[in-house]
């Protein structure tokens, strides 16, 4: 059995120290942008270097999260972040954006790549494709059962990581547009506002029918390790250090076979939503998994914080370090340090002449004294500093860090990095065509003359006229149904279907296995030109761009593959495996449709199919009156969900002729306002 790795969240330097001192084997953290927890404190460049040095001194690995979607305008920032990670000695990078993954693989080939759970990979076929794309590890979805995890472990060519404690989203990770559409704060961009924790009710529901209890699989760690899971992840980069310490210690006890019921009670007290759930793992889905944070939960947390601080009390810093700093005009700066019998000396850059405010001795003292997180205590600091010099804080930090590394003998091992000029090849579109997706084939109109292609649910293609231009849609929630879906795709191929659409890597691979042309659909999260290029390299035929980008961003995305935008329909806000309607009635009572109602009375339709539920937006996107503003696109997607045949005919005519006025309530989606 592989030695289990306990992977702890570090949303701040304080949480990182708590994780290390409590027994974590690895931590994951983010820099100030481009990570899925932008509201956490996170780490600046210097803090990242110090965090890596501190962790490596304690034989703890550091995984950097770059697990968000990145726009074309942010690609240079992303490359700079990869360079920083290489220089700092980060042990792996966690990625969601397939274009960023390819960029890392080219510029930093020695950097291990971990596929974020935001990539929504659910099958062995998807894991094998990740291996081909250069990934060494995948973070599995939280929605998997024990049997599904076991099957993936038996067939995976990459390491597998599972969440074992922390917050549980209602939506499958990477498939949520809820926060983005309701408030322009994208969960795919690290800015989720958690609207699902607000009151949403199904018929006869609890009033909070999108809010799940926190996950806890700590009791199953040994069992999962025997199956082949190599890393056990704790969610919580926005949580307090006390929470991190308690969760790490509880996981460590589980690995070591230690029973500590009092610590478990404290862990529940420090943060829970009416307790914990293991429903997905045990394949016991239903109302027992739902919960909210009540007043009693908050009161319990305040009562255990002081107690939990003792889990990560400060290490004994038994060595005093004295510094001597010299900065003279025209000469390289120098820093000498003495700790016990050991002396070290290093030189830096020649200081600059100050253009405005000169660096003071006090400022130098403040930076050199920052030895927290090391085994040293700061002693005397002698400073010889000429007047009128400017010394960047980063240079002082670098000198201090290198001196401490020499004293400690734990210099981080950097990885090679070769910067790349990111050139975006402009796209030139052909004629803008209509592609129509129908959830119900009975709503397909009779007149197809102006429709490029009709998309129907996989399995319904043989109910549609064979002479028509038909393609099929693979469900986004595949999970353990991969073999059944592959057989259906093969049947579609035999029937004469040539193209299929998928919103996950799993679906794309299954489509290719069945001999069909794959198209990237909703859920593929195509946000930049590098992602387009990567998908083209995988053989993708057509690409639906992310509904979270603006028209201006979409028009600027490069590449050759035909691409389009979501131009009409109710955006699918959530893909859920635990149906919210189970809070109000059993599956036997359900007619595959329902609705959620928010606190203002706004209704969101629910569509249940293929073992999952989709929560749709309350109103459709409508752009037929602004067709001239949809430029440089090869197609427009009209996404029909619960419309009648009469309504679909009317909408299609609007987009053929160019309507001057929308029918009823509508939204422009995110095509103008975009997301954070």
Model-derived segments and spans:
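Surface-exposed amphipathic alpha-helical tracts and adjacent flexible/coil segments at the periphery
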Residues: 1-22, 26-36, 49-52, 58-86, ...
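Conserved phosphate-binding/catalytic loop of the ribokinase/pfkB sugar-kinase fold
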Residues: 119-123
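Glycine-rich, highly charged phosphate/nucleotide-binding loops
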Residues: 43-48
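Short glycine-enriched, charge-decorated loop/helix-capping segments at active-site entrances
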Residues: 36-42
